[in-house]
Design a protein with these regions (language model features):
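Bacterial Sec-dependent N-terminal signal peptides
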Residues: 1-21
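Conserved SGNH/GDSL esterase-like catalytic core that processes O-acyl groups on lipids
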Residues: 22-27, 32-118, 145, 151-155
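Conserved beta-strand segments of alpha/beta enzyme cores
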Residues: 59-61, 135, 169-172
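Generic structural signal for well-ordered alpha-helices
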Residues: 84, 120-125, 157, 161
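Alpha/beta-hydrolase-fold catalytic nucleophile elbow
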Residues: 98, 139-140
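A short helix->loop->beta-strand "cap" motif at the edges of active sites that frequently abuts
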Residues: 130-136
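Substrate-gating cap/lid alpha-helix
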Residues: 143-175
């Protein structure tokens, strides 16, 4: 009888522990994710707003890095930033990726555009290695205003669509 009670106690303890674990959401990206230039960034960036909307059953973390590029040969590759390493260790159940805007920079896109889809798929795969059960959501590019040096931004959504066609779910951050 003691064995049965002991085993039942252990089973119940594990059942309660698994219910208490929060669903982890990793928000990965550039300054849009980080919240650069937003007043009260810690509470107004989109990952903080998402946390508020999802509630206590979720743990949403901001792994944005201002100026980050998706391209590994870009001028500030996301995969070389500490935010990336932290995001991998977090091993989110959901990974929302919003990268590509800084890749439209003339220092990157003209030279490395052919690497975009490959680098995106590699990034997605790295998160799947960290948590094989994770669901990856790829955000569409936020619009680029016309008074910018990023004239090739209209080409990036095509790259994102190629990544999306390989199983991640697209997410629209536009109005």
């Amino acid at each position: 009888m003691r064995k049965i009670i002991g085993i039942l106690s252990i089973f119940l303890a594990f059942a309660f522990m698994s219910q208490a674990q929060k669903i982890k959401v990793a928000c990965v990206g550039n300054s849009v994710t980080y919240g650069y230039g937003i007043k009260n960034r810690e509470t107004n960036c989109y990952p903080a707003q998402l946390q508020q909307m999802l509630g206590d059953a979720y743990e949403v973390e901001n792994f944005g890095h201002s100026g980050a590029t998706l391209l590994n040969k870009g001028y500030r590759p996301y995969t070389q930033q500490e935010a990336y390493q932290k995001a991998l260790r977090f091993a989110g159940d959901y990974v929302i990726i919003h990268l590509g805007l800084n890749d439209t920079d003339p220092r990157a896109w003209p030279n490395y555009r052919d690497d975009f889809v490959r680098d995106y798929l590699s990034l997605i795969e790295s998160f799947r290695k960290a948590n094989p059960r994770c669901k990856v959501w790829v955000c569409r590019m936020t619009p680029v205003w016309t008074a910018t040096h990023r004239e090739k931004s209209n080409e990036i959504p095509l790259g994102n669509e190629n990544c999306v066609s390989r199983k991640p779910t697209p997410v629209h951050l536009e109005k």
